[in-house]
């Protein structure tokens, strides 16, 4: 990996981000709308899974270059997008919550091909449910883990407040719970 201090980003992820930010939206571009919403006192949170997470990081970096300071990025199973110089330049300017499922290979996929790219150093590692048979990168696994964490925290908070919390007895379901794949239909104008 080159250590010359020049910021480098993955060309494919950068092209995708450029295309997204240049897309028309309400008489402006998506980038202009996001930039207008990203200035203090507002906080702008960008999030994504896999490629969407890579784009969220690069979009936040571009918005930071335009003066936005209230940026938060939450990625789920995102690949590395830049080199060490990129990470040093933006690591303090955007609040990044990098979430990775234990065993998710996408986190290190880009580094396996090129040593130019590095992940931001901090990350939160989630464990899949013990009964899951999903591929570690599957978005449904991330959604399941997020919901489990939410309800665990909610239950702890309700208990702390002294509220009655229904006890499920810790019994496993008679059959596994199936989460259907997420899908959406986009308007053809998009």
Question: Model-predicted segments: where are they?
Answer:
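Catalytic nucleophile loop
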Residues: 52-53
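Serine hydrolase/lipase
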Residues: 2-47, 57, 61-190
């Amino acid at each position: 990996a080159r250590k010359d201090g020049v910021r480098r980003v993955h060309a494919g992820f950068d092209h995708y981000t450029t295309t997204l930010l240049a897309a028309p939206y309400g008489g402006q571009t998506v980038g202009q709308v996001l930039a207008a919403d990203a200035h203090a006192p507002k906080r702008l949170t960008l999030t994504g899974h896999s490629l969407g997470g890579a784009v969220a990081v690069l979009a936040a970096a571009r918005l930071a270059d335009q003066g936005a300071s209230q940026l938060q990025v939450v990625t789920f199973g995102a690949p590395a997008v830049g080199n060490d110089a990129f990470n040093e330049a933006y690591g303090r300017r955007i609040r990044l919550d990098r979430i990775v499922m234990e065993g998710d290979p996408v986190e290190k996929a880009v580094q396996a091909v090129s040593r130019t790219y590095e992940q931001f150093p901090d990350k939160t590692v989630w464990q899949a449910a013990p009964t899951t048979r999903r591929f570690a990168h599957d978005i449904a696994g991330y959604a399941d883990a997020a919901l489990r964490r939410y309800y665990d925290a909610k239950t702890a908070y309700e208990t702390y407040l002294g509220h009655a919390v229904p006890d499920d007895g810790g019994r496993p379901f008679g059959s596994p719970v199936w989460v259907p794949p997420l899908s959406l239909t986009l308007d053809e104008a998009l």
